[in-house]
Amino acid sequence: MIGLLLVLHGSKIKEWQEIVINYAEELKRHFPLVEYGFIEINEPKIDEAAKKLVERGADTIVVVPLLFAAGMHFKRDIPNQLKETSNKAKIIIAEPIGFDKRIVDILKEKAEKALSVEGTSYQ
């Protein structure tokens, strides 16, 4: 069975956890096993979330980093934190978000909304 593991940096700001919980809930419509883990600061850590997926029956875990680029967290920290779990399940790490034109639309929408709140429009 396939498990989906959302991975993000972590933050002392509570909203980070709320955001990933919302993404996880939406993704449960497409994947039966979804967990999330943080690289640092917050709980659960990546390895704990991966172990939970294995306990729930995952034999393959697709790790989806909520990161924009393949920096040290992507290249070093995520694989290192999943070493133990890789003996129990196949680990597939998806690419970071990177550049995606769909995100350009979201950024444009956010900018337009900010301008409208100020009572200004760029058009």
Curated annotation (Swiss-Prot):
Please write the reaction equations for the catalytic activity of this protein. Answer: Co-sirohydrochlorin + 2 H(+) = sirohydrochlorin + Co(2+)
Which pathway does it take part in?
Cofactor biosynthesis; adenosylcobalamin biosynthesis; cob(II)yrinate a,c-diamide from sirohydrochlorin (anaerobic route): step 1/10
Residues the record marks as active site: H9 (proton acceptor)
Instruction: Please list the GO terms describing molecular function.
Output: cobalt ion binding; sirohydrochlorin cobaltochelatase activity
Mention one GO biological process in which this protein takes part, according to its record.
anaerobic cobalamin biosynthetic process
List the Pfam families.
CbiX
- The EC designation for this entry is 4.99.1.3
SUPFAM superfamilies in the record, alphabetically? Chelatase
The set of disulfide-linked cysteines is: none
For this UniProt record, the keywords arranged alphabetically read as follows:
Cobalamin biosynthesis, Cobalt, Lyase, Metal-binding
User: Does the entry feature the keyword tRNA-binding, yes or no?
Assistant: no
User: What residues does substrate bind to?
Assistant: E43, F68, A69, A70, G71, M72, H73
The function of this protein is: Catalyzes the insertion of Co(2+) into sirohydrochlorin as part of the anaerobic pathway to cobalamin biosynthesis.
Quaternary structure and partners: Homotetramer; dimer of dimers.
Q: Which family does it belong to?
A: Belongs to the CbiX family. CbiXS subfamily.
The protein's name is Sirohydrochlorin cobaltochelatase
> Species name for this entry?
Sulfolobus acidocaldarius (strain ATCC 33909 / DSM 639 / JCM 8929 / NBRC 15157 / NCIMB 11770)
Q: What is the lineage of its organism?
A: Archaea, Thermoproteota, Thermoprotei, Sulfolobales, Sulfolobaceae
